[in-house]
Amino acid sequence: MKNTRLFMFAACTLFLAACGRQTVKIMTPPDASNRVLFGAEQLQTTLDKAGYQVMMQQGDTTFSDPEIKTILLTEVNDTTLKKEGFHISTTGNLTRVSGRDGSGVIYGCRELIDRVNDSDGKLNFPEELKDGPEMVLRGACVGLQKMTYLPGHGVYEYPYTPESFPWFYDKEQWIKYLDMLVANRMNSLYLWNGHPFASLVKLEDYPFALEVDEETFKMNEEMFSFLTEEADKRGIFVIQMFYNIILSKPFAEHYGLKTQDRNRPITPLIADYTRKSIAAFIEKYPNVGLLVCLGEAMCTVEDDVEWFTKTIIPGVKDGLQALGRTDEPPLLLRAHDTDCKLVMDAALPLYKNLYTMHKYNGESLTTYEPRGPWSKIHTDLSSLGSIHISNVHILANLEPFRWGSPDFVQKAVTAMHNVHGANALHLYPQASYWDWPYTADKLPNNERKFQLDRDWIWYQTWGRYAWNCHRDRTDEMGYWDHQLGKFYGTSDENASNIRVAYEESGEIAPKLLRRFGITEGNRQTLLLGMFMSQLVNPYKYTIYPGFYESCGPEGEKLIEYVEKEWKKQPHVGEMPLDIVAQVIEHGDKAVAAIDKAAGSVSSNKDEFARLQNDMHCYREFAYAFNLKVKAAKLVLDYQWGKEIKNLEEAIPLMEQSLEHYRKLVELTDEHYLYANSMQTAQRRIPIGGDDGKNKTWKELLVHYEKELENFKANLALLKEKQNGNAVTETVEIAAWTPANVKLISNYPTVKVDEGISLFMDVPGKIEAVAPELKGMKALRFNGNEQREKGTSITFETDAPVKLLVAYFKDDQKKYAKAPKLEIDASANDYGQAEPVLTNAVRINGMPLANVHAYSFPAGKHTLMLPKGYLQVLGFTAAETKVRNAGLAGDEETMDWLFY
């Protein structure tokens, strides 16, 4: 058969040579690996498209015809080359591509392919070139997750089915994706899912745990085999990610358990199920790695250590033992929601081949100058000596506009090496992670745009600099000008304007979030804007700890800046007013550059028009934000100086900001389906995104217009009060009425009031309490039991109620941790994410407490609360108006002006 193919190739060669096509011969050894053959195939395809007649010769590698351009592909045991490295040498008509391994041959072929493509088909091969990657792992992820919850399921719970993920079963789409990874010299593919095992393996002891039907299960087996085989021949390592502790829904229902509960203890049943799931997966898919997230459904570091060392690692070892393997495949551990170094210290004696992963700038892209406590996590992990992976995660602040700044990416990857000590890259999609494979672009006839088509420059920039970030800036500008010129059908000189637009616009979202954001996480969608209340009193919205200290250069929040101005104190670092001035300059330059390029674009014109529109969107957003910040500065000036004119001068700035925001609405309304792809209750800033609401600029405009109306009305009242014309009313705050519930848990109760004790073994008594809480029927607890076991409450109610839980404002381990969406995606499942009363309870000898309300429908419920001291102040059906109860003192804030 092989001889027949060679004869046919030869015959075709003679025929086409007569037609004037230059012949190129590609030779591979008789024992060539699948990766070498794949490299040859890719090279053949490129040369064929460039107009060459390609002869493929496997077996005899003798250079016998000096008149024919010949390329010889071989693997060599050359220790001067890095793993995946290659050596290209050209003498006369013979070009040798020698790879340290099969992947090295592939990347050597890609080098030749790039040179052919970048030179209009010329065979300008290097006389001598050695190259290899700087980062050991260079990969991208795909989420088997969706924008909203599946009915009856919790966060991250998405079985692998054609109904939920039709694209997962599309082999052509996977081939395109894998080829994209190869083209960008990436060698790893991560699949993210909450609990994939119940879609991919069957367990003899728990046959009912399978979450998909038999037909789907067989499809999943076939797809996983296909995917891993296709990935392997491209030198790509497939890695399956999973969260802990999540159970399959049928397994949980069989035993009367929840699929996930952050605050429940580890039990033998849950551990056994998970260990056997992992063992079965390792045995069935031996070439697939595992990425372990010890969260978000586990609470304490002690549990994390126990779970990783006594369940996960033993499960991996069980699977290896069943295969008779003695090696240790890589096991990757995320630092998210755990003390990764502590876990690693406990795990390394048990399992050596451990990798670590931590988010680069949290869940956004904010800086190429990372620092602070989050950088220390990186350096602590990279100092362990294992491979440490920098995770460019979610990109919440870049959704949904196009982003692709080569300069920013090169500097960011350099920081990964030099600041964090990372030697591997994990890359999320640029936007719309939760809507993969589609973008947020609105197209005619309800068509959808694919991320791979739109965001090609995102993958190409990160892939290029993960391979080598030490490239000359001038050379790089020329490289990207040429790439953009090819894509848009214009000259390199004109394409430089497109690159400038990308690089100027690429600074806007990072700078604004790091100086004004509440969080870098999914909780905030920056490009929808922010409310004035969030700018003048950000602390009310719970700034994520470590964010400002880690995700940008040293600098000041607006509220800090104004305070220092009034106190005549020296400023430090990046200033908020400088940043908003810079972003409008970036916006102006981006628009000027992209508009200048528009006239000569001849290819991908529709995509260019959308890119051009995005640049205009960025500019309008920057102007709207700039004016709003200036208005917020005046409001904060009033807080210190009590000059009404400051508030009056804020109004025209807010009005001008709205004018730019209305232009943004016009630019986005027919171009985008949404801003944020996570469309659940986890989205809180600028406003709650429950049930897919408040996801467009048109929806937000109504809220921002109302904000201005409220401000004008409150300013008028303030003026009347100042002029002595207002009637002063004394507002008496009524106590909330306790609700009637059947408390099944056996806890004693007590009426809330000053002087009573809420703990049976802690001496402190209530010194002060918010009036809303007086008379509530609180539960009394043994504090030591709370610290050891957590708090579990079972009750039954005939009507909807709210359970009031008070968390102490202290990060000591003995106090239970308040809900935090950045590390616990279930932290708003009961509407409990934000406190309804802040500074509401003061107990002698303990910190102040904030009160959170957990909402429940009628029925029987069990709520597990975290380990540590907390108070359960009872049940109510009353409307719980959010306010600061003020027990910390009369701290005046200005956010009330906007309500």
Please name every model-derived segment.
Residues M55-K82:
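Short, well-ordered secondary-structure micro-motifs within conserved domains or adaptor modules
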